[in-house]
Swiss-Prot record:
GO terms for cellular component: cytosol. This is Tryptophan synthase alpha chain. The alpha subunit is responsible for the aldol cleavage of indoleglycerol phosphate to indole and glyceraldehyde 3-phosphate. The keyword Lyase applies. The keyword Lyase applies. InterPro entries: Aldolase_TIM, RibuloseP-bd_barrel, Trp_synthase_alpha_AS, Trp_synthase_suA. PROSITE patterns: TRP_SYNTHASE_ALPHA (PS00167).
Length: 272
């Protein structure tokens, strides 16, 4: 059983929902990032999605795309992100870490080498936005051999054939994209999301977690009532926008705002 699977099993036994924050590796600066991960756990994160900075993030909305730009400007590479996860693992051996990114940086490192580095760093799951499940065969095999889960996206516009491929090949949890568009989009139709989540759960035993458009306690509670977990990114990383990454006070204040949002989201989920 992987760390992700074990965490969901524990949450189910406790009748709790997973809170999964998304943050960009190296944002706002590399020296603060590991501390940020630990603070997220202290404020209720059950697992964490870590974005891999990439120069052409086609599925990212402006908030997350800018986070990637800040991380790249600070010199954060995919290898650096893995080093940060490894440092996090020195103190936290329980909280699952999922890497979310794009294939190009992984292909540069090489699938075999990348998966080995992930295992050595303590990564638990991988979500490659631009890797279709039908083309993921060898990559999926490498991950399975190293006890890591490969996670795929489902969305309102996923075609039936692709949907079945995702349900067949996905591990850990299903990431359901609640909106048509990019990360950080607005207008969340909770009734439609509830129907979609119920339909997915009728086809798989995997937990279903919902991301895109969850910003506050109200949306967290509305979605958490139907999903096994929520994924929140833009509402957190937007706090690092327009600050001086070298200003210790500004970074600390931004992180305080992020943790206040985490407390709000955790409280909403725990009230269900």
């Amino acid at each position: 059983m992987t760390r992700i699977e074990s965490t969901f099993e524990t949450l189910k036994a406790q009748n709790k929902k997973a809170l999964i924050p998304y943050v960009m590796a190296g944002d706002p600066n590399p020296s603060n990032f590991v501390g940020l991960l630990h603070d997220l756990v202290k404020h209720g994160a059950d697992m964490i999605e870590v974005g891999l900075p990439f120069s052409d993030p086609m599925a990212d909305g402006p908030t997350v795309a800018l986070a990637g730009e800040r991380a790249l400007a600070a010199g954060t590479s995919t290898r650096d992100a893995l080093k940060m996860v490894k440092e996090f693992r020195q103190q936290d051996t329980q909280t699952p870490i999922i890497l979310m990114g794009y294939l190009n940086p992984v292909e540069i490192i090489g699938y075999d080498n990348f998966v080995s580095l992930c295992e050595q760093s303590g990564v638990d799951g991988i979500l490659m936005v631009d890797l279709p499940p039908a083309e993921a065969g060898s990559f999926t095999q490498h991950l399975t051999e190293h006890a890591m889960n490969e996670i795929f996206l489902l969305s309102p516009t996923t075609l039936a054939e692709r949907r079945q491929q995702v349900l067949t090949h996905c591990g850990g949890y299903i990431y359901y994209v609640s909106l048509k568009g990019v990360t950080g989009s607005a207008t969340l139709d909770t009734d439609d999301v509830a129907k979609q989540v119920q339909a997915i759960k009728a086809e798989t035993d995997l937990p279903v977690c919902v991301g895109f458009g969850i910003r506050d306690a109200t949306s967290a509670k509305a979605i958490g009532a139907h999903a096994d977990g929520i994924i929140v990114g833009s509402a957190l990383v937007q706090n690092f926008a327009d600050i001086d990454a070298n200003d210790i006070t500004a970074v600390a204040n931004a992180q305080q705002k992020i943790m206040a949002k985490m407390d709000e989201l955790r409280g909403a989920l725990d009230s269900l």
